[in-house]
Regions:
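Twin-arginine (Tat) signal peptide motif
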Residues: 1-10, 21-24
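Structured C-terminal helix/loop/strand segments within mature extracytoplasmic catalytic/sensor domains
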Residues: 2-4, 14, 27-39, 146-147, ...
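Beta-lactamase-like hydrolase cores
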Residues: 24-72, 290-293
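Mid-domain, small-residue-enriched loop/turn segments at the edges of structured enzyme/sensor domains
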Residues: 49, 142-205
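Soluble periplasmic/extracytoplasmic beta-strand elements of cell-envelope proteins
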Residues: 51-56, 64, 80, 101, ...
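Acidic helix-start/capping segments at beta-turn-to-alpha-helix junctions
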Residues: 57, 97-113, 148-149
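Active-site SXXK
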Residues: 60, 72-100, 266
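Conserved catalytic neighborhood of penicillin-recognizing serine enzymes
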Residues: 107-143, 151, 186
Length: 294
């Protein structure tokens, strides 16, 4: 059994019972008001703008900061694109083993997986999903969008889930550009993202096997070790999808499963144009530490 297959099997166990049925007696932690206060202080200390929403499925608590304000999706859209692919597989409209052959002309910047697979046998839809989610391969992300009709089709799928906020308008790499304040293109809010992740990973938007596969890809992500993952305590299982545009936007969305049961869903969007990548990572890691206490 391959590494991702083992992770999919493990992830499947996480959905054996509904999320709220796994609740344990609430451990000593921080209430929503204290969490909001800590997030506000983190933003003030770090500079820039920070949008966060946290949902603890074990106790039903929610907390956030600027959670209804819009931020650029950047590569966090790739988790949603992979989920839409899985929804289409569930409906018999797509097959994970469908193979696409492509050329050098299809490549865009940051394509660590696809650049090595030009010509020959190409890649399967499953491989594009894995590359897009676990290594944020931009060409893979574009092929996922192409597979179901482009950004507008992804937005329509999100609307069908009840997400009236998140929208995708462009493909990689243009979707990372933000022209001016008030530009709604390719944006989401932290609250909208958390609610959508809850439906995808713990609701009935996907079949059980597809929920497990999506979770497995998130758990296998290799780009988020210094972000939310770095803040959650040892022993927690974390799956995430990062997003970065290189000009001040740094994001991370995901879910963390504590050993005691339940799950914590987090979306964190950070806009700090004058700060370094290391600074962004530290801010997002602190969000993980705060989220674990809700």
């Amino acid at each position: 059994m391959g590494l991702l297959s083992r992770r999919a099997a493990l992830a499947g166990c996480l959905f054996a019972v509904p999320a709220f049925a796994t609740a344990r007696a609430q451990q000593q932690g921080l209430g929503p008001d204290a969490i909001r206060d800590r997030l506000a202080k983190l933003e003030q200390k770090s500079g820039g703008r920070l949008g966060v929403h946290i949902l603890n499925l074990a106790n039903g608590s929610r907390a956030g900061h600027r959670e209804h304000e819009r931020f650029l999706l950047c590569s966090t859209f790739k988790a949603l694109a992979a989920a839409f692919v899985l929804a289409r597989v569930d409906r018999g409209e797509e097959h994970l083993d469908r193979r696409i052959v492509f050329s050098k002309q299809d490549l865009v910047v940051w394509s660590p997986v696809t650049e090595a697979r030009i010509g020959a046998s190409g890649m399967t839809i499953a491989e594009f999903c894995e590359a897009a989610v676990t290594l944020s391969d931009n060409t893979a992300g574009n092929f996922l969008l192409q597979s179901f009709g482009g950004p507008a089709a992804l937005t329509a799928y999100l609307r069908s889930l009840g997400d009236e906020v998140t929208r995708l308008d462009r493909i990689e790499p243009a979707l990372n550009e933000h022209d001016q304040l008030g530009d709604l293109r390719d944006t989401t809010s932290a609250a909208a993202m958390v609610d959508t992740l809850q439906k995808l990973l713990f609701g009935d938007a996907l079949s059980r096997s597809s929920r497990a596969q999506l979770a497995a890809w998130l758990i296998a992500n290799k780009t988020g070790d210094r972000r939310l993952r770095a803040g959650f305590p040892t022993g927690w299982l974390v799956g995430d999808k990062t997003g970065t545009n290189g000009s001040g936007s740094a994001n991370d969305i995901g879910v963390a499963w504590p050993p005691s049961g339940g799950a914590v869903i987090v979306a964190a969007y950070c806009r700090q144009p004058e700060r370094s990548a290391q600074h962004h990572d530290a801010v997002l890691a602190e969000v993980g530490r705060i989220a674990a206490q809700l």
